[in-house]
Swiss-Prot record:
Name of the molecule in the record: Protein strawberry notch
Composition bias type Low complexity, residue spans: 256-265, 883-901
Protein family membership: Belongs to the SBNO family.
Database matches in InterPro entries: P-loop_NTPase, SBNO_Helicase_C_dom, SNO, SNO_AAA
Gene Ontology biological-process entries: imaginal disc-derived wing margin morphogenesis; Notch signaling pathway; photoreceptor cell development; positive regulation of Notch signaling pathway; positive regulation of transcription by RNA polymerase II; regulation of DNA-templated transcription; wing disc dorsal/ventral pattern formation
Listed Polar residues bias regions: 194-205, 980-998
Chain intervals for the UniProt region annotation (Disordered): 1-46, 190-211, 237-265, 317-345, 883-1043
PANTHER family per the UniProt record, alphabetical: PROTEIN STRAWBERRY NOTCH-RELATED, STRAWBERRY NOTCH-RELATED
Comp. bias regions, Acidic residues: 11-36, 966-975
Length: 1653
């Protein structure tokens, strides 16, 4: 008899790899590469599987290699010289003493006959055997001794079909082991059961030959060939004819030279009575699996119709069930009555229909073994002892099966029970830890709790030797806290070192918003001043911060240090008389002012940069502070962009002053490695470092995954050049409120989408009609997508305004005050509308409409009719006033503006100041997307222009004031088109279409190469410009419209608007181009204009007319839509919340639209008679802080550095409610925004409210931010943290998995790849086709340049930010479905990475779940680096993670919830059950529904408060507390609650065994890894880890080389805390790499130490 321990015929070792605890739910064996094995429902290419499935259904066999399809009814298995071989593997579970005998039939074909007496214990499935996401068959044993019947294979356990799609690969190592496995069956072959089945002639010796030949034959088959063998068995079923008598041959496999043909319809599989049922079961489960495959590939409409038609069997609803399945009920002595098979099949299919309807995921994943086991048992019960004449009751079977389906579904989860334990056992580190200076015991405690990232907190900073010179009074008074003094000390100490290239080392302050970077910087300046270095440069983002700088210096006692504004200086030597002999102190500059230039090109100091260099001197050793230094990012941009001028200037300043003491200060400075290019003083790359240049550094870091920057940051902290703390968010609460979109809003949104799509078509057509040059088209499309993005963002924000007003009023009613953050003000759109309406407004202006309208007016590729006709000489007409107004922007019609402008001015520089203000008011010809960096560049260029035209301090001041106030446009950048045009010409480095911009087209790509040509024409342009200016002035002065008494201010503003370069907008450029073409009409050769080849003449008049008509038509449609678009968000909020008297507005706009007492709407200036414009925001802030106003509205960039917290020093100490209407999709940026109301020295913490709509993944972004806030200690709506402790990265989409998912989605939509995940089943249309159409409308799918007429993907199709911005332009339903499909794809990609062991979790925490971590050994290598020496350490640690029974009982004693306690698994494996202990956390607060103030939704939440929302912690005997939490609902599918007495033996057994027995061996009886001679630590209580810690950066390349050559694992960063309290963070080193790496590190270290513990 066969041993009960043996599992299967073909795999007796370890089939239960689906229970591997380290494979994250993998469906693959340990040594199988998931990329090499294609699996139904899980593989990428299902074509082969689908074809195979369809052929089986239609009665056609699958053609083997080079063969032709064969009808199944006459299918044959022929060996020998025949080429046709079966294509599937039959894995037969021998758990119930079945015997496989191979004999030879008269036709010399193989016979695989399974005979055996099956017992009645209905052991229908062997729990120790497993499949690979395959078809599983459980047999239905019948009465012992039943007479043999037709066809089939008698099995006591399960038949497993392994469909491997279309690839000639070996199936794992199993094929090579087949001879051994088959030979193991020799003894069984001689059993009486075998002989009684008609194989008595087979002797013992012949059995050996039989097995040898059979194994040889099977081993020679490819996996595809093996696959069809099982298909054939299933196809024959129990209705096949009886087997032929066996031949008397010594071998069961005889090779026929002629390849004999079997009898038509003959059965080649003999079997017992049980075989009928067995084959039926095989047929059934194969049918279910194949249906799943076909559904997955979209090739089976019958699956889709499953729930409706109630017929799962046919290809069409009217077809009969397939012939491949028969019923278990047909197995009588004679094979059942005729026709019973069809009835049974119908019943079986009906039952499986219900099962799949209840569990639709089976369509893609297949039906799990355990579900099938339960299902089959329920199908068998009605016919346990069937009477031969008893009619079948299909209805009873169906009902029984359906009733069992729920329980079967529950059991399905058992397989996954242990899957992810070891994968996530280390978990994700708590992101932050409380902070206190480690090595400096100086000063008083910081007034608020401060935290540090987990990785940095594990690294001790270098020793302190620097002695501060600050007065004791400053230190002891607490004006500088202990952690600020620590920063000052380390910065000063770092400045003592020189880098290998001779320049002085710098220091990076990475403190978050609100910690007090400003005062820290003031302390560093004071320290250097006391050391005799009296000069310092402080470069920041806003002029308003100059006042904060003066305040900070004053607060710490440095009253003697003066702060000078760079923009106040004239363009002359700073230390000269004209600049008041400024020879010491701090020069405060913005990044914009830093790159300013004078219009006077002959002066020696015509640029601010030269002024500063002269003032500092060549040997300058003083301070240069780059505050908010992330504004200098994009020095090394990606894609087609160019380095920003800001970044280049910051770099050049450091190069020119190599001995200067540089301090970088930015909360986000080191978060993005590519934004560190200007941080050349940190010694991370360059001479004497591991990286020769920045590109080497960036390549190395980005290749190493999520934890790479943490390693860099830790290394910098170790070297004493970096410090980063954040304010704890303890006490802060936040809630997410979902604002439902009304049907009306959705309708307006979708209509807007349609109009933008139409606009794109018109722009494309018109550009072709007027023969626009390529550079012009690039500019135009850059503007198009910029406006497109802002339009829809305005629309999204406007949808939430009413809800925000309600929340704000409610908060004020309860004694709180409100802060509302906006990204932009939309002022330029308001001014445009004022100009159109002659200053007479009837309602609030729609910003969204204004964006669209202004864009079309300025950039539609169609010229002004009159002007172009005059240019082309078609007819001559005196230009109408309107045409002049089009180009001159008729400002004179607005008396309100005149009054407002006049009111603002009170000094003799009125005209100049109003000039600049009016420049600001023009809307942007160069408007770009919402990004801070572009805001910086815009400001820079405005400054550049200002510098060109101003030489006195007041004028320069005006311009810089303009810059700071234009921050109101924040990331909207509604700035003057003229100004930015001038800027773009003045500096070819300005690139408004880059730096986070959604715009992908860069009109400045070749600007540098064209510079010389522009210079040659400069003198001609100047003459033309002067002439134009005179004409404009005259036109304005003699305006016949009635404006005869314009103020000098408005006239000056009007002239200033027109004082610009000749090419201003697309329309102007077109007219310029057409004029040139007209001049060239009739020329023989094309002439280059601005580097572009021109055609011989202008386009025909009708083409121009058509373009003009399209523009007018588009503007009419915009006007109609605009009547329904929402008004300006800022104006509406102010109006609804009590008007300007109750709302403090801190933006940069100069005017606003208000509703007067009589209900009329008018535009008024924000300026007040007693408040200068430059201090207006500061005054407004003070009114809010003094409690005069209850609401503050801030525009994000304008409020940079502003403090609105409930400060102990101010009167208004009420709690702040910070309402966010637009969440950035970066959690880092969101935290920066929250720094306005959450800062040091506050009385109470703020409350954040995120308003989200169901558009474009807003809910997911809110989840990202919520997770980050939670990790910082914030509370979800006042409750303690209750969400799953999962990796934050699962919410983050801007990472390599997100980019990979986006690429996959786009390629799937285009049909380049098969879908990784199926499209939504509830979508009525053609999903991919409809999505593709929508993406064409938003420019992600474009007309191919190389193959016109062919659609292709845009070059930046895999840019995440661009994708998120663009899909806003899709209809609401489609954009949500597309985003959902994208996130589903990303999840699938992450799961693939997990299965392959390639998933990068970031930093993992060893010991976070309470394990004991003990250090066993330490080897320390002391190595040199750029600024000194630092240790590199190799730690060996032992982790004990088990939980003894007594500890579990102690924990159990503290539990009180009825659902808490011990649980046992439903499933029995290897005669063992899993014991766990469950501790209830509490109900999960779903981020999408929690914390609404709506009473209705509150009641809904109570109703849905079910077991699915109750989250549980799980403790296991061998691995302790699990990182992954599960819901009670999921747990009860897999486990049942038991008393502690019942759980104890199971608990202690696993605990004791796990000290040296891995989970595979424990649950399966053996482990493949161990049998192959390898170590297996899966599920072990104790583990050894090797961790490389300390200064790793300098040896990182060598580490990676060894890891790559000896192990295919990635570099995993882990953190641990030993039982002795030692913190260790470093890179996990695989055992195979330990010895070679230690040897390598020994080879060149300066000093070595080794310690054993």
């Amino acid at each position: 008899m066969t041993s009960k321990k043996r599992k299967t015929l073909l795999d007796a070792d370890d089939d239960n790899d689906n229970f591997d605890e380290d494979d994250s739910g993998s469906d693959f064996d340990d040594d199988e590469d998931p990329d090499q094995i294609e699996v139904p429902g899980g593989g990428r290419d299902l074509n082969t599987a689908v074809t195979y499935a369809q052929n089986i259904r239609s009665g056609v066999g699958v053609a083997p290699k080079g063969g032709i399809p064969i009808p199944i009814s006459g299918a044959k298995i022929v060996v020998g010289n025949n080429k046709i071989k079966p294509i599937s593997l039959l894995r037969i579970n021998n758990n119930n003493n079945n015997i496989v005998t191979s004999v030879n039939n008269r036709n010399n074909n193989n016979i695989i006959s399974t005979n055996g007496s099956s017992n009645n214990n209905n052991n229908s499935i062997n729990n120790n055997s497993q499949i690979i996401k395959t078809t599983t068959v459980t047999t239905t044993p019948t009465t012992v001794g039943a007479t043999p019947t037709v066809g089939g294979v008698a099995l006591g356990g399960k038949l497993t079909v392994i469909p491997i799609a279309g690839r000639n690969v070996a199936l794992d190592n199993n094929l090579s082991n087949m001879p051994k496995k088959l030979n193991n069956m020799v003894t069984a072959m001689g059993s009486p059961a075998a002989r009684s089945s008609g194989n008595a002639g087979t002797t013992g010796s012949s059995q050996g030959g039989a097995i040898g030949s059979t194994s040889s034959y099977l081993n020679s088959l490819t996996t595809n060939e093996l696959m069809n063998l099982a298909a054939y068995v299933a196809a024959k079923g129990s209705n096949a004819p009886p087997p032929p008598p066996p031949s008397t041959a010594a071998n069961s496999v005889r090779h026929s030279p002629t390849g004999g043909i079997p009898n038509p319809g003959g059965n080649f599989f003999g079997g017992s009575a049980a075989a009928s049922t067995s084959a039926s079961a095989a047929n059934f489960n194969m049918a279910a699996s194949l249906l799943a495959q076909m559904s997955y590939a979209g090739g089976a409409s019958q699956i889709r119709a499953l729930k409706v038609a109630g017929n799962i069997g046919g290809v069409g609803n009217n077809q009969k069930p397939p012939p491949i399945a028969t019923t278990p009920g047909s197995g009588g002595p004679a094979g059942g009555a005729p026709g019973s098979g069809v009835k049974g099949n119908n019943s079986m299919m009906e039952a499986v229909q219900k099962l799949i309807a209840m569990n639709p995921e089976y369509l893609t994943s297949g039906i799990p073994n355990t579900v099938f086991q339960m299902f089959m048992q329920s199908m068998q019960r009605p016919q346990a002892t069937p009477s031969p004449n008893q009619p079948m009751n299909p209805g009873a079977m169906v009902t029984s099966a359906a009733a069992a389906a729920a329980h079967a579904s529950a059991v399905a989860y058992v397989q996954q029970e242990e899957d992810e334990v070891d994968y996530e056992e280390m978990g994700v580190a708590e992101t932050y830890a409380d902070y206190w200076p480690a090595k400096l015991k100086l000063g008083k405690k910081h007034p608020d709790a401060v935290v540090e990232t987990a990785s940095l907190s594990s690294v001790e900073p270098c020793d302190v030797y620097y002695k501060l010179s600050l007065p004791l009074e400053t230190i002891n008074s607490g004006h500088l806290s202990a952690l600020q003094l620590e920063s000052i000390t380390y910065a000063s100490q770092a400045h003592d070192h020189l880098l290998p290239d001779g320049s002085r080392a710098g220091f990076l302050i990475g403190d978050g918003a609100g910690v007090g970077k400003g005062r820290t910087i003031a302390g560093i300046i004071y320290e250097n001043y006391l050391k005799g270095r009296k000069k310092a440069l402080w470069i920041s983002v806003s002029n308003d911060l100059k006042y904060d700088a003066e305040r900070d210096l004053s607060d710490i006692g440095a009253t003697r240090i003066e702060v000078h504004a760079l923009n106040k200086f004239k363009y002359a030597k700073i230390s000269s008389d004209v600049n008041n002999n400024c020879k010491r102190g701090v020069i405060f500059s913005t990044y914009s002012a830093l790159i300013g230039e004078s219009n006077n090109k002959t002066g020696k100091y015509r640029s601010r940069f030269r002024q500063l260099l002269q003032w500092c001197g060549e040997d300058f050793e003083g301070l240069i502070i780059f505050d908010e230094c992330h504004k200098a990012k994009n020095l090394c941009p990606v894609g087609s962009g160019k380095p920003t001028k800001t970044g280049q200037t910051v770099l050049e300043l450091q190069q020119k002053l190599p001995k200067a003491r540089v301090v970088y200060a930015s909360a986000t400075g080191a978060s993005e490695p590519k934004n560190m290019a200007y941080m050349v003083r940190l010694g991370l790359w360059g001479q004497g470092t591991a990286f020769g240049n920045f590109n080497d550094f960036i390549t190395a870091v980005e290749r190493r995954g999520v934890g790479a920057m943490e390693i860099v940051a830790m290394d910098m902290k170790l070297r004493g050049m970096y410090i980063a703390r954040q304010l704890s968010f303890k006490g802060v609460s936040f809630k997410i409120e979902e604002v439902p979109l009304s049907k009306e809003f959705r309708k307006i949104y979708d209509q807007s989408v349609e109009l933008w799509v139409e606009a794109m078509q018109k722009f494309t057509e018109a550009a072709e009609l007027i023969d626009a040059e390529s550079r012009m088209k690039k500019t135009m499309w850059g503007q198009f997508w910029s406006s497109h993005q802002r339009f829809f963002k305005y629309l999204c924000i406007a949808a939430k305004v009413n809800h925000a007003v309600l929340v704000a009023r409610e908060s004020i009613k309860y004694g709180k005050c409100v802060v509302i953050g906006l990204q932009s003000t939309g002022e330029a759109r308001t001014l445009d509308q004022l100009e159109r309406d002659d200053g007479e407004l009837t309602d609030f202006v729609s910003t969204a409409k204004g964006v669209f309208q202004s864009f079309v007016e300025r950039h539609f590729p169609a010229p002004d009719r009159n002007r172009i006709n005059r240019i082309l000489g078609l007819y001559d007409e005196t230009p109408s006033l309107s045409s002049v107004a089009d180009s001159t922007s008729s400002l004179s019609n607005n008396s309100n503006i005149t009054t407002a402008a006049g009111k603002r001015k009170g000094s003799n520089n009125n005209d100049n100041r109003s000039t600049k203000i009016k420049k600001k008011k023009r809307s942007g010809s160069w408007e770009c997307s919402d990004s801070e960096d572009e805001n910086t560049d815009m400001k820079r260029n405005r400054k550049r222009d200002g510098g060109n035209s101003n030489s006195d301090s007041d004028e320069a001041n005006s311009d810089d004031d303009l810059k700071s106030d234009i921050d109101d446009e924040d990331e909207d950048h509604d700035v003057d088109s003229d100004q930015r045009s001038v800027a773009s010409d003045a500096s070819s480095d300005f690139n408004p279409f880059f730096s986070g911009s959604d715009s992908d087209i860069d009109p400045w790509v070749n600007a540098r190469s064209k510079k010389s040509k522009k210079a040659q024409k400069k003198s001609k342009k100047k003459v033309k410009k002067e002439k134009t200016k005179k004409e404009i002035t005259t036109s304005s002065a003699t305006d016949p419209s009635g404006s005869t008494a314009m103020s000098a201010t408005v006239v000056a503003a009007l002239n200033a608007v027109k004082n610009r370069k000749s090419q201003l907008s697309t329309q102007d450029k077109i007219q310029d181009l057409l004029q040139k073409k007209q001049e060239l009409k009739g020329t023989v050769t094309p002439v280059g204009v601005n580097g572009v080849k021109l055609n011989y003449g202008p386009p025909p008049k009708d083409a121009i007319e058509r373009a003009c008509t399209m523009k007018e038509e588009l503007l009419r449609k915009i006007e109609r839509l605009g009547a329904r678009l929402p008004p300006n968000t800022l104006d509406q909020l102010i109006d609804e919340l009590g008007g300007p008297d109750n709302v403090a507005e801190m933006t940069g706009r100069r005017g606003r639209v208000v509703q007067t007492d009589d209900g009329s709407i008018q535009y008024e200036s924000r300026t007040e008679s007693d408040v200068p414009l430059e201090t207006l925001n500061i005054t407004e802030k003070q009114r809010f802080m003094d409690g005069e106003k209850d609401v503050a509205i801030i525009s994000e960039a304008a409020s940079s550095g502003i403090s609105l917290q409930s400060d102990r020093r101010v009167f208004n100490q009420r709690r702040r409610v910070h309402i966010t209407l637009e969440l950035p999709w970066s959690a880092d940026r969101a935290i920066q925004q929250f720094g306005r109301t959450h800062r040091s020295n506050q009385v109470n913490a703020p409350e954040y409210i995120f308003l989200i709509s169901d558009l474009a993944g807003e809910r997911r972004f809110a989840s990202t931010v919520a997770k980050r806030l939670e990790s910082l200690g914030a509370l979800t709506h006042g409750d303690r943290r209750a969400t799953e402790t999962r990796d934050l990265s699962q919410f983050n989409i801007d990472n390599k998995y997100g980019r990979q998912a986006l690429e996959t989605v786009m390629r799937t939509i285009m049909g380049y790849e098969s879908p990784l995940v199926p499209p939504p089943t509830d979508y009525s249309g053609e999903f991919f086709k409809d999505i593709a159409g929508a993406l064409v409308g938003v420019g992600i799918i474009v007309n191919s340049e190389s193959h016109p007429g062919v659609l292709s993907l845009d070059k930046d199709y895999n840019n995440i930010s661009k994708f998120l911005n663009r899909i806003l332009g899709c209809p609401v339903d489609l954009q949500n479905r597309l985003f959902k499909y994208f996130t589903d794809t990303m999840t699938a990609i992450i799961q693939q990475a997990k299965r392959g062991g390639r998933f990068d979790l970031g930093i993992l925490d060893l010991g976070a779940a309470g394990e004991n971590v003990t250090r066993v050994r330490l080897i320390r290598f002391v190595r040199k680096h750029a600024t000194g020496v630092a240790p590199t350490e190799m730690h060996t640690v032992r982790v004990e993670r088990g939980m003894i029974w007594q500890e579990a009982i102690d924990k159990y004693a503290d539990l009180f919830n009825e659902n808490e306690g011990f649980y046992l698994s439903h499933q029995l494996r290897n005669q063992k059950r899993t014991a766990i202990m469950v501790v209830i956390l509490e109900s999960r607060n779903s981020s999408s529904t929690s914390s609404t103030t709506d009473l209705d939704s509150g009641s809904k939440k109570k109703k849905t408060h079910s077991k699915k929302e109750i989250m549980c912690q799980i403790y296991r005997p061998n691995t302790g507390l699990q990182v992954r939490h599960e819901s009670l609902f999921e747990l009860e599918k897999k486990y049942r609650k038991v008393a502690s007495e019942e759980a104890e033996p199971h608990w202690t057994e696993q605990y004791d065994a796990s000290v040296n027995t891995c989970s595979h061996a424990y649950w399966n009886g053996n482990c493949r890894n161990v049998s192959l001679g390898n170590d297996c630590e899966v599920g072990l209580r104790q583990r050894l880890y090797h961790v490389l810690a300390g200064s790793v950066l300098s040896v990182w390349g060598r580490v990676e080389h060894i890891l790559n050559t000896r192990s295919n694992s990635k570099m995993q960063v882990i953190r641990m805390k030993t039982t002795e309290g030692e913190k260790i963070v470093g890179t996990l080193i695989p055992k195979s790499c330990f010895e070679p790496l230690v040897a390598d590190l020994r080879s060149d270290s300066e000093k070595q130490e080794e310690f054993n513990y």
